[in-house]
């Protein structure tokens, strides 16, 4: 068993959520956060049936600033 990261983004309409796993690059969606994570887990498990988990450092989040015109 391996604990992986799920980054969740709300869809543009707010009716869907997109889930992304940075360790594998897998992505999925769902009508709720829970459904998006469940679908991401399934997509990631399918990915890992054919591919090994990449050797990467654990993901972390940070912030940065950009200039706006």
Kindly label every feature range from the protein language model.
Residues 1-5, 13, 31-34, 38-69:
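Short, charged, surface-exposed hinge/linker loops at domain edges
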Residues 8-23:
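Short aromatic-glycine-(Arg/Gly/Cys) micro-motifs in beta-strand/loop hairpins
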Residues 26-29:
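Short, well-ordered beta-strand elements within core beta-sheets of diverse protein domains
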């Amino acid at each position: 068993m391996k604990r992986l990261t799920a980054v969740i983004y709300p869809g543009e309409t707010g009716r869907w959520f997109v889930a992304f796993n940075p360790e594998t690059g897998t992505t999925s969606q769902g009508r709720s956060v829970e459904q998006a994570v469940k679908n991401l887990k399934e997509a990631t498990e399918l990915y890992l049936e054919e591919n090994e988990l990449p050797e990467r450092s654990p993901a972390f989040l940070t912030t940065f600033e950009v200039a706006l015109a």
